[in-house]
Amino acid sequence: KKLGASATIVLIGENAPYCEENVLKCLNTAKPICEKENVTLIIEPLNDIDRKNYSMPYAKPVFELLKKVNSPNIKMLYDIYHQNMMGDFDIGEVKENIDLIGHFHVADSPGRHEPGAGNVDYVNILKEIGKTDYNGYIGLEYRATKNDGETFGFLKEADLL
């Protein structure tokens, strides 16, 4: 709040006994603070291939936690790269839970390079997200293999530029 930020991204951390229970307790503690201060807490599930022993690498359990917390100020950062690496990317699940998503990250996989360098169909994914009422940010978080301007072609194809 003091920084003037309307949202902050946090990680869940390493896997530990009772992790899900502890995360739920922490989110419920944060809920009234976030709502009072009108700040959004955004949780990012990371794949446990790149980040060994990461707790809750799949989107579905995080969506379930967010439904239990039931706050418009606590959401998920849906990183398509991480979910694809886990073999768990599902555009239907994204669309069903779009109200629980506060931010997207984009990187192709494997390799975490620009869209079009791997196996993720970002043009169609972004078009599908565009059909929802999502109005948040989509962060481009990749290691470019081309000049920056050349890596934005997928945005034009998805009618985002």
Give names to the regions the model predicted.
Residues K1-K25, E35-K36, N135, Y142-T145:
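Structural motif corresponding to the early beta-alpha repeats
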Residues G4, N28-T29, T40, M56-Y78, ...:
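Histidine-acidic metal/acid-base catalytic patches
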Residues I9-P17, I43-N53:
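Active-site-proximal beta-alpha loop/turn segments in soluble metabolic enzymes
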Residues A16-V23, K52-S55, P115-G118:
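Flexible, glycine- and charge-enriched loops at secondary-structure boundaries
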Residues V23-I43, D48-R51, A144:
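N-terminal/domain-start segments enriched in small and hydrophobic, helix-friendly residues
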